[in-house]
Each structure stands twice: as C-alpha cells, then as structure tokens.
Amino acid sequence: MAEIKIQNVEALGQPLGQYSHMARVTGARETLYIAGMLAPGDDFDAQCSGVFRQIETALKSAGAGWGSVAQFTTYLVHSQDIPRFMAWRLREFPKMFPDGKYPPNTLLIVDRLVQEPFLVEVQTIAAL
C-alpha cells in the first residue's frame, strides 16, 4: 500500500489555494495516470462537479479513493473562472479530503479544450 505524505515546504510560504507544495509517495505498488476528465454541464460548477465525479469513478475502478491522489493538473479555458474554481474547491475539497491535506495542483489557463463547451479539465495521478 502506498503512503502519500502531503506537505508544504515552510521556506516556500503558504500555498495560494487549496493545494500543497508536494506529495511524497513511498511503497507504491502501482501508479495511476488518469486522463484529463471533462464533463458536460450548463455552467462552470456543474462541469467541475461532473469532472470530479468522473475522477472518483476512475479511482474506485482501480480500488483507490481520494486519499490515493498524489497530484492534479487543472486546465481552465477562462481566467475569470479562477475564482469560481477556487470557490468550488473551498466548498467541495473538505468533503473529499477531510484531513485538510490537499494534493498538489498545477492550474493552467488554455486557449480551449477539445470541444468548445468544455470549461474545465482535470488530470490526476494517484498511487496505490
């Protein structure tokens, strides 16, 4: 069973949001690389919820859960959605990560995703 130690580096200061500076993985038998997930929806929050439901489904299919996540990479189409994304995480991440140890996350703003209606995509790395 993998041990994932989520931690911040004091010399780097506090992270800007709900993420940690690094995840140290030891004892992993397997590493999961989950493709960027997209979800339909009429608004940004609906897409975020759908994306993370799909990630949870993928994790469960491999016998994993939120505690197995070592890193997220998030792609947003519009920079004005950053506050919405942060608000969504503030509301939902405590349910997903009740210990308050949030995996590292890289947030990128891109020109577009694979199809126009999609506003958010999240890629995940997990360890078992």
Q: Where in this protein do the model-derived segments appear?
A:
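N-terminal presequence-like segments and the immediate start of the first folded domain
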Residues: 1-71, 76-128
